[in-house]
Amino acid sequence: MWTPRVPPPRPALSFFLLLLLGVTYGLFPEEPPPLSVAPRDYLSHYPVFVGSGPGRLTAAEGAEDLNIQRVLRVNRTLFIGDRDNLYQVELEPSTSTELRYQRKLTWRSNPSDIDVCRMKGKQEGECRNFVKVLLLRDESTLFVCGSNAFNPICANYSMDTLQLLGDSISGMARCPYDPKHANVALFSDGMLFTATVTDFLAIDAVIYRSLGDRPTLRTVKHDSKWFKEPYFVHAVEWGSHVYFFFREIAMEFNYLEKVVVSRVARVCKNDVGGSPRVLEKQWTSFLKARLNCSVPGDSHFYFNVLQAVTGVVSLGGRPVILAVFSTPSNSIPGSAVCAFDMNQVAAVFEGRFREQKSPESIWTPVPEDQVPRPRPGCCAAPGMQYNASSALPDEILNFVKTHPLMDEAVPSLGHSPWIVRTLMRHQLTRVAVDVGAGPWGNQTIVFLGSEAGTVLKFLVKPNASVSGTTGPSIFLEEFETYRPDRCGRPSSAGEWGQRLLSLELDAASGGLLAAFPRCVVRVPVARCQLYSGCMKNCIGSQDPYCGWAPDGSCIFLRPGTSATFEQDVSGASTSGLGDCTGLLRASLSDDRAGLVSVNLLVTSSVAAFVVGAVVSGFSVGWFVGLRERRELARRKDKEAILAHGGSEAVLSVSRLGERRGTGPGGRGGAGGGPGGPPEALLAPLMQNGWTKAALLHGGPHDLDTGLLPTPEQTPLPQKRLPTPHPHAHALGSRAWDHSHALLSASASTSLLLLAPARASEQPQVPAEPGPESRLCAPRSCRASHPGDFPLTPHASPDRRRVVSAPTGPLDPSVGDGLPGPWSPPATSSLRRPGPHGPPTAALRRTHTFNSGEARPGGHRPRRHPPADSTHLLPCGTGERTAPPVP
């Protein structure tokens, strides 16, 4: 059998893949790799805090792992908010190899609060006091809030001694119930501004103002126009407003299912709420707008998920905030850094409003002539038309309540991201910025932290022009911050333990404070010692923190340093600086575990698709060919069977005599032809009550196959005739026609009874008529109508005859039926194979009662009188019975 073989790869396929690779590089430009990758062995030199106290090298034996929630740096002191504990850690000296706490505050939940928490269905590990708010209230006071087993509580503590100051207060609307929920908080003018949830089920999201000398205010409750499942990220104070940065589901895109967008909202610090009729004890200055961080083009590519925001910094004389955005989890992985000018943010809140006139309509801008005056959202103050927000007209208050969304989005500086990283293994979620890097303090370094603790360091050069664009950012370095030997191995800590919580710059010590759930690591901002001994590498690193010293070392440069050094952050050619071993770019991509090449990924995907398509095509072709080959083999097998062993199955039974006469056995041979004795073909023709052994075992007479029925003599299908009238039993042509039709109909469901060819050689032995024959006439006379019963056959030697045999049992209850089936007499001419077996003698030829079916011409001379069928005719036609078969 032919088996297909898969052809070898053709040069055309290889050429196609190479061409595809070239096109891919053109469509997806490769992102620049870092100029340097810090070796992982440097992690062992970084100081780490894991809960160790004074005089301890490690945490106390048997102590729980840390579960850090908040980190606050105040000058040279670091406060770490943990589960049930608050630590005070001194950051000096900066050369220490271990960070230890100097003071520790244990703040556990009450047993009653824990019992209530467990009754509400929470786990034991959740019913603890997690520090979620950690703020500096004044120069000597810390404001701390904890979840307190899903019953938030807040208190004031001394910053120096961690002693409780005053009584505790409720943390509702100031601290979330669940430690997994996000929240932001800040103090401004002695008032606490928080953004969190106010209920146990985290349904009611709120921006809340409390404490201070002004009334408590909150956002409208359960209004999707104000909030729709928000996730609060950061809050900053600027001017007379407090700005909140968050992401939420956009109601203006309700026709696009759930679309997450980034927002900035603001409220006036001096807002005192609305009138008793509208917005009482609620914000009257709350407005929100969208943050636009997208790649420009015919169709903008948006980074909609806000991850982190810096404080307000000055870049080129502008108040700027930097924000990290990412794509949704079900989209192409990517992150971007966009900068926003606070002046442009404020200008958007002075623009047009957006509204939805009906729940089914889309959101459209509100015409300026429909905006009431004074402008909704403004800060009412003494000296203005309205001295306080509570004095505003109801028209303005109603407009603010129903139109909190601005029509325009806040554009990013340069209308494009400053930094874009796509197809990273982990998204960027944290950001820290140093706007005074370098010996002259005029360089801007951006540190981006990923979910797994990998930090990317970029040098950005913002343009001081009005457009606010920036030049190409330089990817300086990539380094790790998570210490698995102290913070826990990824196999045990998992992704949760390695998640980067915060990234804060400690410029005084030249380091970064990276907080993880189980540890806090201080990492230097630069590793200049890696380039010592090679001037080309030190200067080629373009790192503002590093410079080449005359003694042949690469040193760390602090702002205002007076040391002599060489540095080039512009990226000029270093060809004239000589060569040295371990060139910088030669070892860049040795261990870039956090990045994946776009070109490699796209090319591999397309190549896998092409190869899979080719293999699938060959597989389908092979299976189709296999099915065709099996079908061909099946047809050949059938033909072989018919040609060798089954020829008698398709030949006319009337030709068996010729096959026997011409076969190897001939008539007198013993073989009986190549297909065996023809009696084997006739055995299945016998029905119940007739023996097959008489044909298979033979007898004293051979079977004359020439006398078998031909297709022309095959009876026609039986057609049931209408029942004649009971009085139609008189003599005449009508009675004969009825009997003739009865005989024809009964013959169609009967067997073929054959007589041997040598029947004429046997003497005629008269036999006594059986009981059925003697009773035939009386029973037939009693019949009122013909029944579907077979006829009694009679032998006739003159020609081939077809008679009827019984095909089913007779119903003895029918008293007016025709005579029952005929049984052959027990004569000496019929031999039995056993004492009880049926006769095995060959059957004699019989005559068909339907003379119309006899084949004309060519018959042998008649040796016996024709059979008498008068007993089947209606009453009065005769009393004769059929003579027995001799």
UniProtKB/Swiss-Prot annotation:
Lineage: superkingdom: Eukaryota
Sugar attachment sites: 75, 156, 292, 387, 442, 463
Membrane-spanning residues: 606-626
Stretches for region Disordered: 655-677, 697-731, 761-886
Membrane topology (Extracellular): 27-605
Post-translational modification Omega-N-methylarginine, affected residues: 667
Any Gene Ontology biological process: central nervous system development
Record-annotated disulphide pairs: 117-127, 145-154, 268-379, 293-338, 487-519, 528-546, 534-580, 538-554
Start-end of Gly residues biased regions: 662-674
Record PROSITE patterns: SEMA
Tissue-specific expression: In adulthood, it is expressed ubiquitously.
Gene3D superfamilies from the UniProt entry: ligand-binding face of the semaphorins, domain 2, YVTN repeat-like/Quinoprotein amine dehydrogenase
Location relative to the cell: Cell membrane
Signal peptide: 1-26
Family: Belongs to the semaphorin family.
Assembly description: Homodimer. Binds specifically the SH3 domain of the protooncogene C-SRC.
Protein name: Semaphorin-6B
Organism annotation: Mus musculus (Mouse)
Encoding gene per record: Sema6b
